[in-house]
């Protein structure tokens, strides 16, 4: 139900573009234009036909809004504001606006092209912007994972990642740039449409010229909106997509080597704001250092740009950024605090308006020492010593964390890694353990299945003699995770892509303490 509009959006584009082309080409071929120029005006005739097509489009949109809602309710999944808003946005973008684009495409072809040429242009546009376009666009670059992302962003109007397992935490992307795509193409087709009307209209030519200018403006605004940087979860074959960005980066940038720090971070105070990407103010309380120099080396994923580093007195400290390493200089070995301001995103583990998935092992906050984050795939890294965390998250959607939620909405507690989830996510308590899960996953996260599999794991845990603290199980999205990422054991909680596989992964050797 969640992905129905997105899987069919290419069909809506095909249907309305061909229907529009037939309607308007017949109008042009019947020579009706010459008859109406001297009477009601050519614009009113085309406007009337367009209104009929738009009315049909509205009806289709309403149906494909109500049907997924009804299906979701009948399936027993929780009906939340996030789910209703998502289905509404999906219907607007992938049904209505795709239908409008189809009408515009057909009108453009009817006004400017001959019969067969028009069909050819429509066919090529649909081919490039539909699901097959992802493979076609990669051919000139010698294969997948090499084409520039802007090319995919320009042409791939269909949802990306339909051939991959759905991310039930997130859904398919409905970020602002997806609407900017439609705006660009509506403007691109609207410009020649209104220029043509200005040529053939008997009157109101200035109105059509103004509409042409507005279309050009829409095209420019759409282009600007498309290229704005930020966190985008894109399971596509583009060079910088969620699938390929890290592999391409580390092909030309050596991953950091493992080198233990001569200090520890005693506590973190993280103030995070999530909009188009992650914006962070991190206050770190450091232990004494045994080093002779005044430098501290941290690991912070290279996708985050450090704006400033200051000490406890507010003095700016010099720092150097090289790949995943951050080297801070200018202070002695005494205990002190550092305040770092940085912003950015991880290409696969997203932080945007639609959702958050920030595992505690990807160094989205500074970790002490030099750590290797990539070795043929993402390598989970955790500090040797747990720290005290206080985490505040300003996000459009509710955020879930394994740390205890405080009255002011922050999270706090001692851990060796903080994981944050947001989106189509909920939590429940089973067997004394909090389970954070994607409620749209009707396979493993139906209430009865979730309870059964969690209790099975807890029994296996007791049988294995695992006495380590366990307060939370966090079910993570499956987004091309490496084997090491699929189940991660922290000091006080577990994250994994499936509860049913936790016992086999953690206790395969028959030992509980590992």
What are these regions (language model features)?
Residues 1-27, 197-209, 219, 434-449, ...:
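Hydrophobic alpha-helical transmembrane segments
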Residues 117-130, 207-218:
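Central hydrophobic cores of alpha-helical transmembrane segments
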Residues 293-295, 303-357, 457:
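A surface-exposed beta-strand-loop module
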Residues 342-418:
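Extended, low-hydrophobicity, Ser/Thr/Pro/Gly-biased non-transmembrane segments
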Residues 81-82, 138-184, 204-276:
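N-terminal, polar/Ser/Thr-rich
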Residues 2-11, 15, 21-22, 50-118:
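Secretory targeting signals
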Residues 19-59:
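Helix-loop-helix units of permease transmembrane domains in multi-pass membrane transporters
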